[in-house]
Amino acid sequence: MGKAMLKLCITLMVLVFSGTAESKGVMRREDESFPHLKSRLCGGLNGLGEDAYRSHCVVYYTKRMGVVSLDHVEELANHCLRIVKQCCAEGAADDCLQTELAAVQEQVCTRMSEAKDVPLVGRCCALAGSERHDCFHHAGGVAEGEGAWPHALPVTSPPEYDSVTVCALHATANARLYDTLLWEFSRRYPSASDSHLIALANEFITGLTTCCLVEEEHGACLATLREDFKHKLTEASHKSQNLCKALKSLGKEKFEDRIIVRFTQRAPQAPFELIQKLAHRFEVLAEKCCELGHSDRCLVEERYTVDDELCLEQSFVATCPRLSSCCSLSGSSRAQCLETVPVLETSDKASPATPTLPISEQCTLWAGKPVEFHKRVVWQISHRYPTTGVAQVEALAHHYLEHLTICCASEDKDTCIATEVAEFKSEVEKVHTKSDWWCRMSDLLGTDRFNLLLIVTYSQRVPQATFEQVEEISHHFALITRKCCSHRKNGSCFLEERYALHDAICRDEAWLSGLAEVSRCCAMDGRARILCFDELSSHLNASVEERPELCSTSLCSKYHDLGFEFKQRVAYGFGQRFPKAAMGQMRDLISKYLAMVQRCCDAMSDFKMDVEEVELRAHRLCLDAHQLGEEKLADRIMIGLAQRISVASFVNISSVALHFAQSVIKCCDADHEKTCFMEQEFALEDQVCSDSEALSHIPSVSRCCELHPFDRSVCFHSLRSTQASTLASTHVAVGKDDSLPGHVEECQAFASGNHSLTDQVMFEFARRHPRASVSQVESLARLYSELARACCALTDADQESCLHTARSQARQEALKSLQRSERICNTLSAIGKEKFEDRIVIALSQKATDASFEQILEIANRMSRGLARCCEQGNNVGCLMDHRHALHEAICSTPDGSLPQSVAACCNTSNTSTTTSTTTSTTTSTTTSTTTSTTSTTTAAEIRDSCFDNLQANVSRAHAPFYSNSQLCLMKLRTPHRFLERFLWEFGRRHPQAALSQVEELAEMYVKMTDSCCGKLHSKSCFTEQRHTIHMEIRHAYAEVQHICGSLHSRGEETFIQREVTLLSQKAPNASFEKVSQLARHFLSLAKKCCAPDHAAGCFLEEPYAIHDEVCRDDEVVDQVGGLATCCRMSGTSRAKCLAQLPRDLGRHGNRETPEFDELKICELRRDNPAVLMEKILYEFGRRHSDSAVSEVKNFAQKFSHSVTECCTSEKTHECFVEKRAAIEKVIKDEEAKGNLTCQRLKAQGVEHFEQLVILNFARAAKSLPMEKVVEFAHRFTRIAGQCCEHDTHCLIDESFHLHAEMCGDHGYIMAHPGVANCCKSDVSEQGTCFKIHEDVHHAEEILSKDVSPAHPTAERVCLRYRQFPEKFINLALFELVHRLPLLESSVLRRKALAYTGFTDDCCRAVDKTACFTEKLEAIKSS
């Protein structure tokens, strides 16, 4: 069977399809000799490599025998590869192929019955003897009348697998999956070039890799991938159909001329003879494909076919090393490589654009071989200008040959041709000038504005075109311009937009089939085609409206929904309306029109929002009326009045408030609620101005009442802003104030149950804080009233001092609110409303994870407007708008029915009754100090706030959102103003525990990815690479979380706090110890919440970001540390860099290495509170070594702590401290010297080399660690070392300390190795010995279990990993080798690992991969 299959394979290699461009080294061409066949086959094998060659075999056999199963095709392909290797091996007989071919024909027809269904095979097998031999050897493809590939399947994308099946197949049988894709694509498109089919399979499996290994939303990703491929295949089919129409309309000669231009531009290094031969082959292939009658399956693309043919010309490829390396690739990888091969000529030594032969020889060739000479002229111009359009090359060639004809008939040929060449050069210079202009405009205007310019230009030139056609052509020309302008340095940019426009039109199926006149013009070339299109444009002007659409609701809907496309459509419409207008004038008109639309739509949007807000406020007012009752509603109205008219008395204000409350209740009666359009602010003003007895007699109020309603509102606003108290005078509201009764009157009022005192307190707070929310004023007043009520329960002697304390406490709460408000307003002022609203979007998304994007935007906009109003005064006078409180207010102000389920329950708490629990304890004391009662009152607002704080986030979503590349580019184009916000929402709801700045950074990374990749020539690879980077960033963050939680679980809270104290003291060395300790405990509470089982899935708490957020939230720290306020206005990496560059002011602390303590105090602290002592020591060491590793700082802190213990119990305390300090300073200097050596090694070796050696050291020191952990720990250490080494001094880094710290921070590792837990609890200096003992025990257990080293992964698995992430493969090699050869030096192991990575590429191409790996591994072991 084996021999038969061998012969069968050889036979099929020369079977059919001879004379075509499908010659990837796997078939024989017509009349081709066996020596030449062997040369081609062996050249293809050597050029492609075994893996790619086998892929071509799979494609070839599937195309020829599509009815055969995949198993049979794979068997044929494997035999094919083995035979070619056998016959191409050194020492193989010259007649190897011929000998095999002579004996296989009978085997094909007798052993492969299913192949007879293929028409050509069946026809040959029906013959006998020499006729059969001739049929197999000389058949020229599908016979006439037999039809094209009857076994071909319908045109669709590959079969639809469910995500679980295809991802499992991808993980376990990647090679089989790849063969399946090749088989499926080849059955559906048997006319496509091998390279094209391989490119499709490669792209599809790359997409599968992304969906299965990177993206977590597998189903959505695969569905999008299939849709993209359906579109891609349809587009490729349309290109082929257009090619067929071009061939039919132009004729063979002109078509071949155009192919010469394309092929020359594709391979400018190739000689004319080779280009001509390739162009002819492509013309034959295209003609054959287009005559088959199956154009929907005819995938013939120029670039893949020319690449196939070019790479088979080994004699030429061998002269170009870069070209040779490209040809070793396949599919789109090879296409991309060839596109980046540099043109050989430079501007100084560029080839001429006209033939260099003497005039006599030119005339002879032109007269004797006009067709060939015409092609040579076309080649010469294309060779010189590889970026120009086909039509322009044809026009220049026609121009030159016309004048050559005249010169050849002239008596003085030399003078004539010299004149012609000069004129030709002048013509070329004109085009160069135009090209430079387009390049300058492209650079000057940028992508979007340049696109608008093109749309205007093309809509003027072709007014009968649809918007979609103009937009597509503009995009095409923009890509050409970008490519052309990148070649300006070598003088090859040769671009004129008219020719590019007409080339694009003539390639467009819709144009060719839609207008007969267009087809007629496209059949012409050069200037004739230009004139034809000019005439066409002048006779076919589109009928358009005289004026563009003015402001309307429909126009604003388009403006908001279409985004940038709206601008494109405006440019298109203006170009149609004014085809003769100057471009500068058009730009001015379009700019003015767009500005008008923006103003109009902004005004309409503001008005609509104002109306909605009034309706919403009226609705909320009615809800308050129904739920609170008249008295409580009057209290709230009183607060609003006091804020607006701070000059009025309490009596007047309360009277008007009560009257207005009655009006509201009447307005909100059940029969009128839907029509009650009452906004409290304006209605109150009406009430005030109509009440002549209460307030209107006040001069300032009377003056406001005389104004127009809008001006009146402004006037009342100015009243409250000018009368408001400043931050410094806030204490008046709760301090000694004539408007407040004395303590006797207060207590009498409380005893009688009179609520007027509480109302009076609310009034005083309201008039001093005119921009505070009503609930905040109520909260402050309630706090004071409850404290005062508790004071009144004391004896008369203690009441006054107690009330004074109560007022001070209320004053402090007010001051805190003012400070928070001031911080909010300062932040808003510093980062702007847009950036501030972005942060609100994140906070809302994290709170309401099931809310839609539109809901989040609406709430965020309302909240940002409210905060902006609160902060509209420059000095933020009286603004008590707490961000947390305002956030919840904004969420709950959403109309009923549209609230997300997750937050509806919290908002409904405001409808419940107030829960009050009061515990009163009275203590009478004869001293002046009095312990007041403890009163706890939980209001509805506080219940709501608590509910929001404890919301259980829905974290079942993937870590990163999935949008296809095309979706991202379309979203960026259509809604650029909402693009960033969408990803803030996406990342916020996926990571509800993440630091705000971390969410910002991830969203910005997505935006930058889209900006940089959309419209690029290699956008797919750009997206793939950057998506991987983002996913790795997320995985790294989750690894950080696991490390934090592992550290918390394994070491306990006390040790965790010590670690945070160290980190915080390093991040903010100028902050006080008390503040650092407080922040460390706050971060512990965050970590405990984050590391709880119900939050672990959504926990995205990366330490540096969280620490930065906490530091920046603390007003005291921000005030203490110079420059911190500026940094805190930034976010993400920008803020981290800013904080890293803050100056460390440690000069006043004396010795940099070792902190100095008061010996008496430190011994007292050790006795009374040893935990705080350790924190203080860590704080002092941390701030002195702000760039060092935490484990290093902790090591010396522990040494110092032991010294304190020893010295405090010594009789000679002072002498002991002096001695111990000196010893520790010496050790620190020694460690710094080691750190300097590490930094020198890092600088000399480079980051990559350094990290590889760290991987080896970690894997050798901790054989119990899996590879992923070793790589993760080594990467983190390299990053820390890099940061530490940026500063020349005081760098403490040690690999062993870092490794042990990482192992102790990995909860999963500790659970798997319980013995490590004891090591982690010991002192840092003692951990090394403990870990060594553990590793020795682990190694002994492995020996007993006869599993000394991990088994080598299967060859297929190694190759899968290598193909997917080749840049990370070196890590696997390092890890494997250090476990197998542990006694070798790290530098030697690294060299072997690099060698291993090098031969992996070869072994993964080999047929017997396992044997190849075995042989190579044995070789490097013995080397």
Curated annotation (Swiss-Prot):
Residues 24-29 form a propeptide. Residues 913-939 are annotated as: 7 X 4 AA tandem repeats of S-T-T-T. The keyword Signal applies. Glycans are attached at N490, N541, N652, N754, N908, N911, N954, N1070, N1236. Sequence repeats lie at residues 913-916, 917-920, 921-924, 925-928, 929-932, 933-935, 936-939. One of its GO terms (molecular function) is lipid binding. One of its GO terms (cellular component) is cytoplasm. In the sea lamprey, there are two forms of albumin, AS and SDS-1. This is Serum albumin SDS-1. It comes from Petromyzon marinus.
